[in-house]
Amino acid sequence: MKRAMPFIISGMMKLTIGIATCLLLLFCLVLLQQSSNIFNHHKSVFTKELDEDSCLSRYPSSLYRKTSPYKPSQHLISKLRRYEMLHKRCGPGTEAYKSATEKLGHNHVSNSGDECRYVLCVSPLSGLGLGNRMISMVSMFLYALLTERIMLVDQRIDTSDLFCEPFPGTSWFLPLDSPLMDQLDSFNREYSRCYGTMLKNHCINSTTIPSQLYLYLFHDYGDHDQMFFCEDKQMIIGKVPWLVAKSNQYFVPSLWLIPSFLTKLIKLFPQKDTVFHHLSRYIFHPTNQVWGMVTRSYIAYLSRTDERLGIQGSLKSMYWEHPTLTGAVVVVHQPSQEAHQQSDKKLHNKKTLAEMYLLSMTDEVVISASSTFGYVAQGMGGLKSWILYEPVNHTVPDPPCGRAISMEPCFHVPPVYGCKGKTGTNTGNIVPFVRHREDRILGIKLVQDTS
């Protein structure tokens, strides 16, 4: 009997292995079919030229979320394909890029209209959270799409550790040997080529076009910096070959208030509150290391749950100290295990990005007021979050939370200029699809116009 047992176990093991193998093969076939369906659904958003192995998150990420009800327009799809061709023609390493770089040595340029033009997205080397970086990069990319520019990004920080290259056959990183590289830290509001400063000093007009222009679009920008959002000023800015931009804002809503952009935007985004949803999913794909963090956490903690609630906040100790009223089991998972954002630490930023992605994979999400971290998660997930309002004079608001009016991020500090000489313009009352946000009277955001 003792000798028979191993054979029985062995037979059971073989049967178990056989069943497991069949299930695994079936799962792989389903996964391949789903991946095929994903590509067919997004075939115009994600080109076949992109290498799947070098960026494992690009296609399978949709498997971890519910199917998005928001479909990209054909105009957006075509625009992205044309942009990819333009980036491939004008990107780093090309003759066109070399020719454009040579212009940086000139004070002024004459623009024939057929040269490549660029917008360089620069982030401070410290002090700027990942959420702010991501919402400003989406804003810059939309601006690049609207103005036929190539968007490049600063590679001195950890962008390459966080995100895959989004465009096929080329790079979006400013080369380290670029003449601009040594100047990046000197770009500030006092810089001689700062747009606001030049405008204030009457040093820029339609006949004197500088080879480069610095755009200061941070929350504390001045009145002259804010003139960037004026139609007539865009006509001049559009002729400058190189724009270097620093921002911590999601300034997309104000682009909709520029008449020449509005006609293009309506075609690209018929559903106006899907800008961040579509563009963030297009340009942001976690590197394999970050994607590994996401998938491991998802499989271990989220894959077998009936309903997933994402909360952007520190709640773990709450459920240790206070049971639920109904006795229901609440399990809180936080990959980074860090209560405060540490924007200068590369590993922390990887964990932060992983958490953003995990939040975007939930069924419902609750975020704190003014949280760019939360904005990224809700936008990528296509979710209208519940927003926890900030206390006023140490008093909890009534109600304490409310539903977001759209899944778009908020432009916290929109311009209050008047492009036609008016001051104190209320940018939340100009068009019905740009409104004041739910919990910040000065901020504005895009909504789907139902009027």
Residue ranges and their predicted role:
Residues 7, 322-362:
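Donor nucleotide-activated moiety binding/catalytic core segment of transferases
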Residues 124-128, 349, 364:
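Active-site rim elements
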Residues 18-316, 326:
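Secretory-pathway glycan-assembly enzymes, especially type II membrane glycosyltransferases
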Residues 4-21:
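N-terminal Sec-pathway targeting helices
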Residues 392-451:
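Leloir-type glycosyltransferase catalytic cores
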Residues 314-339, 382-385, 393-395:
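Active/binding-pocket-proximal capping segment
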Residues 145-157, 368-369, 380-410:
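Gly/Pro- and small hydrophobic-enriched strand-loop and loop-to-helix capping segments
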Residues 138, 352-395:
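A donor-sugar binding/catalytic signature common to diverse glycosyltransferases
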